Design a protein with these regions (language model features):
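Catalytic-core signature of thiol
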Residues: 1-237
């Protein structure tokens, strides 16, 4: 089967020096917050990696555009094309891959952003509960997940019951590869009875999902979480 979209994430090599976000210290604050949504620089921006394996560059660019506030160090993206070219540059400078097809390690891209002076710190958030707490109390998170063929398409049952577009996770479908996406929202207690979900900001243009975004249930993410998740800040800690 030919995949309708291109992926491009690699599993980070283990490094005991990785800083882990101290989410346990934020747990009390997170318990009082159910919902957090971060707004893109332009809510109409939907960058598209096309047929290139640059999801790590594009996902990190989405994270920059959905930061918790306006950061003086972050790039000022004036158009989708400028954001797209920034993402490609981040990928190339991280990997040296002029084919734009070999994929990238998420940690390396975070390190490159730090080298450029665009961020001051980046942290690993390896567990699902760490991701949830980081989203509720800190800011957007990037997640690397195995991408099954079912996930290219929506879950019609959930969409019918709760609206929007939900990622369909069927672990019995074929594994297409690994994908890096920005998570720019979370709702742990939807008021319409829907399951708790993460809002993902994909890099496949506005034609995928709900104008380029989708909901991934937290339970589905638990089944997928086996790779790497990162968050970053313009501040040094």
């Amino acid at each position: 089967m030919t995949a309708p979209y291109t992926l491009g994430a690699k599993r980070d090599r283990y490094d005991p020096r990785d800083y882990k976000l101290a989410s346990h210290s934020l747990a009390a604050q997170a318990s009082a917050v159910d919902r957090k949504m971060y707004t893109m620089v332009s809510p109409d921006f939907r960058i598209d990696q096309g047929n290139e394996g640059t999801c790590v560059g594009h996902g990190d660019t989405n994270m920059l555009m959905a930061g918790t506030s306006t950061h003086k160090s972050y790039p000022d993206f004036q158009s989708e094309e400028l954001a797209h070219q920034f993402a490609r540059k981040l990928y190339f400078e991280t990997t040296g891959d002029s084919t734009y097809q070999q994929g990238a390690y998420p940690r390396d891209a975070c390190a490159k952003l730090k080298d450029w002076g665009l961020i001051g710190s980046y942290w690993s958030v390896p567990q699902v509960d760490d991701v949830v707490t980081a989203l509720l109390t800190f800011g957007p998170v990037g997640i690397a997940v195995p991408w099954y063929t079912s996930m290219f398409y929506g879950d019609n049952r959930l969409s019918s019951d709760f609206g929007n577009y939900w990622v369909k996770v069927n672990l019995d479908s074929d594994l297409a590869g690994f994908h890096w996406v920005a998570v720019t929202g979370i709702d742990m207690a939807p008021d319409n009875g829907a399951p708790p979900f993460l809002r993902i900001e994909n890099s496949w243009g506005e034609g995928w999902g709900w104008n380029g975004t989708a909901r991934l249930s937290v339970e589905s993410f638990r089944r997928l979480n086996q790779l790497d998740n990162w968050t970053f800040s313009e501040e040094s800690f």
